[in-house]
UniProtKB/Swiss-Prot annotation:
Keywords: Disulfide bond, Secreted, Signal. This is Guanylin. Residues 1-21 form the signal peptide. It comes from the Eukaryota. Highly expressed in ileum and colon. Found in plasma. GO terms for cellular component: extracellular region. The lineage of its organism: Eukaryota, Metazoa, Chordata, Craniata, Vertebrata. It comes from Homo sapiens (Human).
Amino acid sequence: MNAFLLSALCLLGAWAALAGGVTVQDGNFSFSLESVKKLKDLQEPQEPRVGKLRNFAPIPGEPVVPILCSNPNFPEELKPLCKEPNAQEILQRLEEIAEDPGTCEICAYAACTGC
């Protein structure tokens, strides 16, 4: 009886993980773990564009949009956070999870649910 119950719980957990997937939450934002994992691929160093871009000081009071948000491969699901004034901080936290998604898949981070 106990073995049957344990097996049923394991199957139910596996089904829930496949059906709903793991959700990463940061403040009012919720994202699928799959979208967060895509950030790792975007972090790869890109060739510097010498002479094309110049560093300008940000205008006070204007939000600073992280460079990552302008990447054409940036996940659609994450784009709403680019409009937030603290987008860079949120992206840094999500990038930490993207670096080691296994700990999120076992719900080691409080921000991860749906394991």
